[in-house]
Swiss-Prot record:
The lineage of its organism: Bacteria, Bacillati, Bacillota, Bacilli, Bacillales. Transmembrane segments: none annotated. InterPro entries: Carboxypeptidase_A_C_sf, Class_I_gatase-like, LdcA_N, Peptidase_S66_N, Peptidase_S66C, S66_fam. This is Probable murein peptide carboxypeptidase. Pathway: Cell wall degradation; peptidoglycan degradation. May be involved in the degradation of peptidoglycan by catalyzing the cleavage of the terminal D-alanine residue from cytoplasmic murein peptides. It is found in: Cytoplasm. GO terms for molecular function: carboxypeptidase activity; serine-type peptidase activity. The keyword Phosphoprotein does not apply. Belongs to the peptidase S66 family. PANTHER family: MURAMOYLTETRAPEPTIDE CARBOXYPEPTIDASE, MUREIN TETRAPEPTIDE CARBOXYPEPTIDASE. It comes from the Bacteria. The active site is at 116 (nucleophile), 214 (charge relay system), 284 (charge relay system). Induction: Repressed by AbrB, a transcription factor that negatively controls biofilm formation.
């Protein structure tokens, strides 16, 4: 695996009046939903700078690869911009990962936020720079919805405060799949994207870490195939613990005879033998709770809790 950093550092927390950059490194955002979300950022007291390719369209991509990559680089290069927020996911981040200037990001570390297809960028950036990034609800995808959950919006408060976060059953019911306690760096994201990193220079490193997974609109046999690939790659047993998050609409459609999602998850997660909890509202769900990738975390299946340290620093950058 290329450039896996052992020393992590947190970006600086935001203050009211700060400028944030909005980009679309994958697919183009819905214009109306994006406009609604930009108003939300203004309500938080933030100034907004839009990427040049944000509203471009090239098939299912938000512009050509070099345009989307240039937006990513420009937002990190611009010292006025204190955070880089992804408008939406979709498809396309894997196409630009090989061109990322990681030295630029190390020189200009700042908040990076998104999920779904953005998982590929989280893995690439974190493992090649050590920067803690945020797997969180996106602007067009989530914040721009008419019925956005208050807790989804509240996730953005993590960017302003250096506060430890404890996930309990007050947020959602949690099921113990494998008993035990575990602690380590929090890594993971969208299962489809994590699987797509295998065999690339950006292959997910789960050794001694807490792995969280989520997905949407994948049938049980597809989840089976991806978990089997992670299993054969040693990614499940390498992990210290596993957090199974939301798998929205992952039900049989094409196949009359099918295993259930629950059966597939239990086959792989239980056999991995690592402490595991299921039911976290992280991913393509409502509410959608943000978590910092690369932050230290601890899980306790008996207490049904996951404690995650702050993903930002209110002072100088912390390691």
């Amino acid at each position: 695996m290329k450039g896996v950093f052992s020393l992590n550092y947190k970006p600086k927390a935001l203050n009211k009046g700060d400028t944030v950059g909005v980009i679309a490194p994958a697919s183009p955002p819905d214009p109306k939903k994006l406009d609604t979300a930009l108003l939300f950022l203004e309500e938080l007291g933030l100034q907004v700078k839009l990427g040049k390719a944000l509203k471009n369209q090239h098939g299912y991509l938000a512009g050509q690869d070099d345009e989307r990559l240039a937006d990513l680089h420009e937002m990190f290069r611009d010292d006025e911009v204190k955070a880089v927020l992804c408008a939406c996911g979709g498809f396309g981040t894997g196409r630009i990962a090989a061109g990322i200037d990681f030295s630029l990001i190390r020189k200009h570390p700042k908040i990076f936020w998104g999920y779904s297809d953005i998982t590929f960028l989280h893995t690439a950036i974190h493992q090649n720079t050590g920067l803690v990034t945020f797997h969180g609800p996106m602007l067009s995808t989530d914040i721009g919805l008419d019925d956005v959950h208050p807790l989804t919006k509240a996730s953005y408060k993590q960017l302003f405060q250096e506060t430890e976060f404890t996930y309990t059953e007050e947020l959602s019911p949690l099921t113990e799949l494998v008993p035990g306690k575990a602690e380590g760096e929090l890594v993971g994201g969208n299962l489809s994207l994590l699987t797509s990193t295998l065999g690339t220079p950006f292959e997910i490193d789960t050794r001694g870490k807490l792995l969280f997974i989520e997905d949407i609109d994948e049938e049980p046999y597809q989840i089976d195939r991806m978990l089997n690939q992670l299993k054969m790659g040693g990614k499940l047993t390498d992990a210290a613990g596993i957090l199974v998050c939301d798998f929205h609409n992952c039900v049989p459609v094409k196949r009359e005879k099918s295993l259930s999602l629950e059966q597939v998850l239990e086959d792989y997660i239980i056999s991995a033998g690592r402490p595991a909890l299921r039911g976290f509202k992280i991913g393509h769900c409502s509410p959608s709770i943000a978590v910092p990738i690369g932050a230290k975390a601890a899980m306790n299946t008996a207490e049904k809790t996951a404690v995650i340290e702050a993903g930002v620093s209110e002072g100088a950058l912390k390691t």
